């Protein structure tokens, strides 16, 4: 499904929070949305593999990487796993790598930057916790919508026709 965050903000201006414009699109889908699962991990993506093994239909993985752009939390292998398990998208408060490969995959990916250095994989982090970045507080179960214009968040799913 295609989402237009500008239109959604016009219709639901009192029901949505707008994330500060820190992110760029890196995935093959330019718009995506769904129910979020939160994860907090700093320069370590081991926990992401476990989460992305789950069925992702209708879901978006929201990764609080502490805003670090020193190591990429998302790479082509992780993004392919997410695509295979039907995740709608990934939002990373951090960096990605292998951007040409990411652009070929049918998944939405938004991140702050790209860098060739990979993250550790020790599995250090927490999931399903409250995270805060971009002027917004995110809870697992909230609903996120993203496109080239921006990212918005709603507590409940928006009625989109």
UniProtKB/Swiss-Prot annotation:
UniProt keyword terms in alphabetical order: Cytoplasm
Subcellular localization, as worded in the UniProt entry: Cytoplasm
Family annotation (InterPro entries): RraA, RraA/RraA-like, RraA/RraA-like_sf, RraA_gpbac
CDD domains with a match to the protein in the record: RraA_family (cd16841)
Similarity comment: Belongs to the RraA family.
Keyword Magnesium attached: no
Chain coiled-coil ranges: none
Tree of life domain: Bacteria
Listed GO CC annotations: cytosol
Record text on subunit structure and interactions: Homotrimer. Binds to both RNA-binding sites in the C-terminal region of Rne and to RhlB.
One of the record's GO molecular function terms: endoribonuclease inhibitor activity
Gene Ontology biological process terms, A to Z: negative regulation of RNA catabolic process
Protein task: Globally modulates RNA abundance by binding to RNase E (Rne) and regulating its endonucleolytic activity. Can modulate Rne action in a substrate-dependent manner by altering the composition of the degradosome. Modulates RNA-binding and helicase activities of the degradosome.
One Pfam family from the record: RraA-like
Protein name according to UniProt: Regulator of ribonuclease activity A
Intrachain S-S bonds: none
